[in-house]
């Protein structure tokens, strides 16, 4: 499945919630009718079946993290093999992706921009360039912006925007050095309550 390249607000309207696909600190519902689906008949929301509800939740989480369907299913399979709660394992696997960690540290204004920074070899992990967005970051890893990329205006702008948001407790960032430490894998209580990962588990368990 190809990556979606259309309007970001349309995806958020389809899921009925802010997917944080746009940069900035202002929630997009102030300029976008999230309660109305896109399209001519968007105001007429169909009643979803149990399967439809589960599918929508899966699509929502997949779009938040910018992961393709095949990748997402593979993450679920890995989460199911791990000990503990499968849904929580799934979210943690998505959270330790390098592109997501770059976003959490504030080096990219969106996950899509952070993924681009990684792909363009602007990011280092423990002093080595890593250009794989799905690279799994471990506790105590140091993520930094490559020296020749530190003058990029978009990175400086992203850090300014990130400074207006509450910084995640599981990362520690030195803006001046453009360097951050991934202190630990976030627990479920650290992450958004707007996600119902159990619906995804139920969907894939069928």
From Swiss-Prot:
Residues annotated as domain S4 RNA-binding: 96-156
Entries under InterPro entries matching the protein: Ribosomal_uS4, Ribosomal_uS4_bac-type, Ribosomal_uS4_CS, Ribosomal_uS4_N, S4_RNA-bd, S4_RNA-bd_sf
GO cellular component term, pick one: small ribosomal subunit
CDD domains on file: S4
Spans traversing the lipid bilayer: none
GO MF term list: rRNA binding; structural constituent of ribosome
Keywords linked to the UniProt accession: Ribonucleoprotein, Ribosomal protein, RNA-binding, rRNA-binding
One example of a Gene Ontology biological process annotation: translation
Pfam families listed in its UniProt record: Ribosomal_S4, S4
Protein's name in the database: Small ribosomal subunit protein uS4
Lineage start: Bacteria, Pseudomonadati, Pseudomonadota, Gammaproteobacteria, Alteromonadales
Gene: rpsD
């Amino acid at each position: 499945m190809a990556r979606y390249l259309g309007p970001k607000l349309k995806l958020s309207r389809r899921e009925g919630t802010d997917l944080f696909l746009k940069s900035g600190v202002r929630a997009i519902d102030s300029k976008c009718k999230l309660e109305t689906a896109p399209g001519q008949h968007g105001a007429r929301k169909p009643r979803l079946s149990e399967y439809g509800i589960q599918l929508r939740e899966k699509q929502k989480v997949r779009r938040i993290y910018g992961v393709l369907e095949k990748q997402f299913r593979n993450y679920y399979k890995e989460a199911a093999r791990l000990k503990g709660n499968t849904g929580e394992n799934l979210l943690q696997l998505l959270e330790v992706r390098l592109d997501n960690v770059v976003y959490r540290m504030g080096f990219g204004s969106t996950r899509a921009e952070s993924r681009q920074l990684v792909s363009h070899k602007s990011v280092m992990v423990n002093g080595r360039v890593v250009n794989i967005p799905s690279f799994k970051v471990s506790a105590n890893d140091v993520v930094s912006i490559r020296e020749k990329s530190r003058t990029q205006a978009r990175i400086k702008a992203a850090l300014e925007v990130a400074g207006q948001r509450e910084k995640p407790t599981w990362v520690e960032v030195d803006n001046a050095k453009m360097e951050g430490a991934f202190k630990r894998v976030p627990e479920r209580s650290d992450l958004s309550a707007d996600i119902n990962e159990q619906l995804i588990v139920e969907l894939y368990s069928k």
